[in-house]
């Protein structure tokens, strides 16, 4: 059975990393920046989770940071917030966050675009997009996600990591429902 690919963005703690890996998501991303602790956190996550591909989320075109991310973190994917920083990237999956643009940006071949979905926007425009190269991001509800999936959307879905209620604790009831709807 083919199901929608799932990318969980902005993972900040091991509670989320372990939960989403156990739930069988396809991708998780975390921000890498000039702060050395972001790389230490990356390596901790990489050691703790299995079976999920990791993408580095870079919010700059700083070539030194990109090089450090590729060499030190060795991600399987890279999420860019601008389109200019991807030239010369090694063989990895490239994602482009187009949530702040109109989506009409020229992207490198085989890259994936991340777009904002809103239920008031014409759903048919999303159904016409290539499901292999499109992920939709929103503040999902089970009804909103169900409507999109029932209409025939086959592309990827983005969720975001969240804050812990207390160290090592978080309520995943709503996320359980969303993931169950996606994987059923």
What are these regions (language model features)?
Residues 1-85, 120-157, 161-184:
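Conserved N-terminal beta1-alpha1 strand-loop-helix module at the mouth
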Residues 77, 93, 111-112, 133:
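Structural motif
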Residues 90-98:
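Phosphate-end processing signature that detects enzymes handling 5′-triphosphorylated RNA
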Residues 95, 113-114, 135, 158:
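Ordered hydrophobic segments in well-structured contexts
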Residues 97-126:
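Internal catalytic-core helix/loop-beta-alpha segment
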């Amino acid at each position: 059975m083919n199901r929608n690919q799932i990318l969980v963005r902005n993972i900040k703690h091991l509670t989320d990393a372990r939960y989403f890996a156990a739930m069988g998501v396809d991708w998780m991303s975390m921000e890498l920046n000039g702060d050395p602790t972001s790389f230490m956190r990356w390596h901790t996550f990489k050691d703790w989770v299995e079976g999920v591909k990791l993408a580095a989320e870079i919010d700059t075109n700083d070539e030194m940071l990109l090089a450090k991310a590729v060499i030190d973190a060795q991600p399987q994917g890279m999420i860019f917030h601008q389109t200019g920083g991807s030239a010369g990237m090694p063989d990895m999956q490239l994602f482009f966050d187009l949530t702040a643009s109109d989506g009409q940006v020229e992207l490198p071949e085989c890259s994936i675009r991340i777009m904002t979905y809103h239920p008031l926007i014409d759903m048919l425009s999303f159904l016409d997009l290539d499901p292999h190269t499109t992920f939709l991001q929103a503040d999902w509800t089970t009804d909103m996600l169900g409507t999109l999936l029932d209409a025939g959307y086959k592309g990827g879905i983005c969720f975001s990591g969240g804050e812990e209620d207390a160290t090592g604790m978080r309520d995943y009831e709503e996320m359980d429902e969303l993931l169950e709807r996606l994987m059923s």
